[in-house]
Structures are given as structure tokens and as C-alpha cells.
């Protein structure tokens, strides 16, 4: 497991910057998906079941001013940065594993 920090900026304003930390990349990816699901629940409070497809999730990710991950790499004793495209790839892999 590699400690992972998710850096998030929802708008261009610096005040929208925040971070979340997780014990692993998988937990971070689940956290990002959960963040989108929570947003959908807020937008549709009367809808009992929330469904979405991956293109909607990716559109949400692209709408964020910034989303990146810092993943701890033990052999260099440092955090390695990853961008939105890497996150999207990890989401695809994560969802494929869930579908099996």
C-alpha cells in the first residue's frame, strides 16, 4: 500500500483548494468516485438510486480546476505526482475490477 494524497481545486479560486489523504491508491480512487457520487446526491436529493456512467464521471473530473495525486514511492522515499489522465486510467482499472 502506498500512502496517497489527493490534491483538489474545484474552481480557479485558491480558496477552493483542499486535500484528502488515503492509505492506498485504490482507496484514493474510491474516494474520488465517492466525491462525485456525493455531489450527484446533493444535486438530486429526491432520487433514491443514483446512477452514472464513466463519461459523466470523467466530465466532472475535467470540470475541476485541478485534481492530482501524490503517491508515496518507498524506493526513492518521496511522493510521485500524477495528473488527471493517470487518475482516469486508475478509475477505469478500478471499475473493471469491480465488474468482475
From Swiss-Prot:
Pfam families (UniProt xref): ER (PF01133)
Source organism superkingdom: Eukaryota
InterPro entries: EHR_sf, ERH
Record keyword Cytoplasm present: no
Keyword terms: Cell cycle
Family (UniProt): Belongs to the E(R) family.
Subunit structure of this chain's protein: Homodimer.
Described function: May have a role in the cell cycle.
Name of the protein: Enhancer of rudimentary homolog
